[in-house]
């Protein structure tokens, strides 16, 4: 696994300008559900128009900021709960090296997990498992992390995330299993931190269970800031959403993360504010590699890239776009969609 990750040490770093530029010319793992017709929030045609710069992406900046903030926290918790180390969380895997030019994947990382065997089945060993296993084995896995702001967490992988995971597995030959990590975080004030269910109930519904862990996110200005830091965990829902929108302007702020279970704010300069977090659900769902996935779906990727090239080279891209939209039939059958549902186990 480590040798594989080192192959891509010089690839564009995730979320860098070079990475964004590369992504505009390729079908990334996170684009796949849309072009396969599996994403209920974005279609093939919207994705095509975005990559061709026919209109700007209609991003929910608050949701993007939330996901980015808590991706780092989720990795820290995964390392703690599974006694592992996540690597390769900044690499970009170009599919050209495996014969899939134009396709790429930017994984949330890779790590080793311990599987324990008991009662005729294998399970992922965590610090919460008080089990004496008959035998154990250590395996490398691909990591995919999601931290929804409001969506209810179920004990399964949403079908529209499965293509992203299978893409990562297909472009990572040494890896035969992925894990889908989904966590439910809640905001709280600094004074609410600790082993209790207290949270900011204006931002999220109240919780009755106790948290698995907690910590602090500190926001610092890149400019000199002398005002007293604010506890953002006391904001109302509207003001907190505005904060998340503001944090999307990444060049204005730096983010610092406490270790899990800390309750004291760190001493540092230019602190604008901070807020506490608690995690109440932390699911780790195994996903096995589907050997034929990319081979079967690559023709659709090629068709998308052909359409994208048509738009970018057309003297009248809007007319070309309308023609593509009017002429194209569904690219994915009902049977294909059912297959993805069956892949969830």
Swiss-Prot record:
InterPro entries per UniProt: NF-kappa-B_Signaling_Reg (IPR051703), PDDEXK-like_dom_sf (IPR011604), Restrct_endonuc-II-like (IPR011335), YqaJ_viral_recombinase (IPR019080)
One GO CC term on file: host cell cytoplasm
Alphabetical UniProt keywords: Host cytoplasm, Host-virus interaction, Inhibition of host NF-kappa-B by virus
SUPFAM superfamilies the record matches: Restriction endonuclease-like
Keyword NADP: no
GO terms classed as biological process: symbiont-mediated suppression of host NF-kappaB cascade
Compartment(s) of residence: Host cytoplasm
Domain of life, source organism: Viruses
Database matches in Pfam families: YqaJ (PF09588)
Coiled coil: none
UniProt subunit comment: Interacts with IKKA/CHUK and IKBKB.
Family to which this protein belongs: Belongs to the asfivirus D345L family.
Function: Plays a role in the negative regulation of host NF-kappa-B signaling pathway. Mechanistically, recruits IKKA/CHUK and IKBKB to suppress their kinase activity towards NFKBIA.
Name this protein carries in UniProt: Protein D345L
Source organism (scientific name): African swine fever virus (isolate Tick/Malawi/Lil 20-1/1983) (ASFV)
